């Protein structure tokens, strides 16, 4: 049996988890932190991990503001009615005004989007959903994360978050192990997501 090693990864940003949130956070971290060292660790493989791994047939919220289909105010009104008034309207508005740009980014990355043959707009299923061929959704977003990260570690099970000794109630690092080799990994980044 080979000797177990300890890998210490120094980085500016450590992203724990390679699902849609983690791969998206890795992409955004690079966008906003061009000169930072960014590392992402995932317990499986970022190409097919997380809830979106099996694929989707629709994106459940798209405003279509460029075609004047819906506006953020419309979505806030819908959410307020649907949730019987229990809604943070400011957060709903903020999400709604940014969601189209995320969808356009997925389109640029190559996510197959169904389109209305007459208008060329995205094909709708209901007021808010647009239809996609989403079998490749997660691998497409994972590819963006791979291009954005300095290093991706697959098969790393993070077992403990380390508390920052200098700031109370702040996570300062993470430790885990490679599920295939048994090697330990530790990281004390400037920021952990």
Where are the model-predicted features located?
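N-terminal/domain-start segments enriched in small and hydrophobic, helix-friendly residues
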Residues: 2-18
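Conserved N-terminal/central alpha/beta ligand/cofactor-binding core
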Residues: 4-5, 36-37, 43-172, 177-183
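Core beta-strand elements of the Rossmann-like FAD/NAD(P) dinucleotide-binding domain
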Residues: 8-11, 180-191
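N-terminal Rossmann-like FAD-binding beta1-loop-alpha1 element of flavoenzymes
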Residues: 13-40
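Anionic group-transfer/hydrolysis microenvironments
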Residues: 14, 44, 192
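Mobile, glycine-rich extracellular loop/lid and propeptide segments
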Residues: 20, 175, 186-187
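Hydrophobic/aromatic ligand-binding patch that stacks against planar heteroaromatic rings
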Residues: 24, 28, 50-51, 192
């Amino acid at each position: 049996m080979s000797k177990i090693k300890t890998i210490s990864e120094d980085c500016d940003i450590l992203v724990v988890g390679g699902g849609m949130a983690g791969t998206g956070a890795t992409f955004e971290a690079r966008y906003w932190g061009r000169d930072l060292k960014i590392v992402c660790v995932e317990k499986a493989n970022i190409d097919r991990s997380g809830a979106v791994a099996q694929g989707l047939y629709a994106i459940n919220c798209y405003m279509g503001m460029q075609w004047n289909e819906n506006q953020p105010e419309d979505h806030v009104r819908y959410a307020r009615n649907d949730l019987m008034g229990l809604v943070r309207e400011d957060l709903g508005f903020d999400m709604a005004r940014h969601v189209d740009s995320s969808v356009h980014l997925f389109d640029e990355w190559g996510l197959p989007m169904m389109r209305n043959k007459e208008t060329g707009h995205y094909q709708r299923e209901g007021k808010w959903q647009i239809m996609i061929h989403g079998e490749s959704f997660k691998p497409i977003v994972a590819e963006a994360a791979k291009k954005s990260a300095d290093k991706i570690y697959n098969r790393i099970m993070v077992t403990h978050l380390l508390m920052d000794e200098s700031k109370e109630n702040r996570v300062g690092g993470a430790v885990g192990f490679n599920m295939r080799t048994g090697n330990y990994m530790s990281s004390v980044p400037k920021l952990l997501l």
